Regions:
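Loop/turn-to-beta-strand initiation segments
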Residues: 133-137, 162-168
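Conserved catalytic/switch belt of AAA+ P-loop NTPases
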Residues: 127, 152-166
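Clamp-loader machinery-focused feature within the broader ASCE/P-loop NTPase space
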Residues: 2-149
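Arginine/glycine-rich "motif VI" loop of SF2 helicases in the C-terminal RecA-like domain
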Residues: 73, 160, 207
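Conserved adenine-binding aromatic site and its adjacent loop/helix in ATP-hydrolyzing domains
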Residues: 124, 156, 183
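Short gly/ser-rich anion-binding loops that grip negatively charged ligand groups
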Residues: 108-112, 167, 256
Length: 273
């Protein structure tokens, strides 16, 4: 993953089209939904960046103003990001000082759900005045990682939003959200790109064309998931051999994979079947 201060890569074309369409619509809360691997987080961040940008255009944030820079370096005072701590770390977002200290001192492990303490901080954030005068944004990803207490705290803020506050919830399992949260948001289902468009995007990320097709099949047609496989999973050749190996009961094909990676590989294989 690139560092948080690096220039943001351009959105995949199917996400850029969705961003442009959503920016033409009004609403204080959006729910971006669809299977994992389609780019919910990237689209959510693009919307937040555009809403907070000092010089936004029809295609979103300018990428050069002070607001855009603050988002790139993860210090924007008007953007509140709610994620499991594991996801915060993976995506380059800093934890608050207390949480980071608890983890550094090995008092606990990074959370895999959105913590109640973080949601309470977000409620306080919602009540503050915008620091830069462009409103405020709360980004929640993956939204289904809220527990019941966190979800109810968010619901109250959704029901009584401040005039300059927007929400963007990105979910890979929207059916797990409270129905009342879903009803308070404008829903948008992420589009599936065509195989050709997805393969072209993977090639643009540095994946060989022949490998892109194999990885895309292994990921069930989901481009982001295919890119993660290219960087962290078995080789494309191994993916190509995996179905027959499993038919033979040959578990050696996954012998060099850590248990979580092996489980994910089998899940993707079952998805394809």
């Amino acid at each position: 993953m690139s560092g948080p201060a690096d220039p943001a890569p351009p959105l995949a074309p199917w996400l850029a089209r969705a961003r442009d369409a959503l920016l033409r619509q009004r609403g204080h809360a959006w729910l971006l939904q669809g299977p994992s691997g389609l780019g919910q987080y990237e689209l959510a961040l693009a919307l937040a960046s555009a809403w907070l940008c000092e010089q936004p255009g029809p295609q979103g944030a300018c990428g050069h103003c002070a607001s855009c820079h603050a988002i790139k370096v993860r210090t924007h005072a008007d953007l509140c990001v709610l994620m499991p701590e594991v996801a915060m770390h993976e995506l380059g977002w800093p934890l608050d000082e207390k949480a980071q200290s608890e983890i550094d001192d090995k008092k606990r492990k990074p959370s895999r759900e959105i913590r109640v303490e973080a949601m309470r901080d977000a409620v306080g954030f919602a009540q503050r005045t915008s620091a830069r005068g462009r409103g405020k944004v709360v980004l929640v990803y993956p939204a289904e990682r809220m527990n019941a207490i966190s979800a109810n705290a968010l619901l109250k803020t959704l029901e009584e939003p401040a005039g300059d506050l927007r929400f963007v919830l990105a979910s890979e399992a929207a059916w797990q959200l409270l129905p009342t949260i879903r009803s308070r948001c404008l829903g948008h289902t992420l589009p599936w790109p065509s195989a050709q468009e997805a393969q072209e995007w993977l090639v643009a990320q540095g994946i060989a064309a022949a490998e892109a097709a194999v990885l895309l099949r292994a990921a069930g047609g989901r481009p982001d998931a295919a890119l993660r496989l290219a960087r962290n999973g078995p080789s494309p050749k191994a993916w190509g051999l995996l179905p027959r190996a499993m038919q033979r009961g040959d578990v050696a094909a996954l012998a060099d994979q850590a248990p979580p990676a092996a489980i994910e590989a089998l899940q993707k294989l079952c998805h394809d079947l």
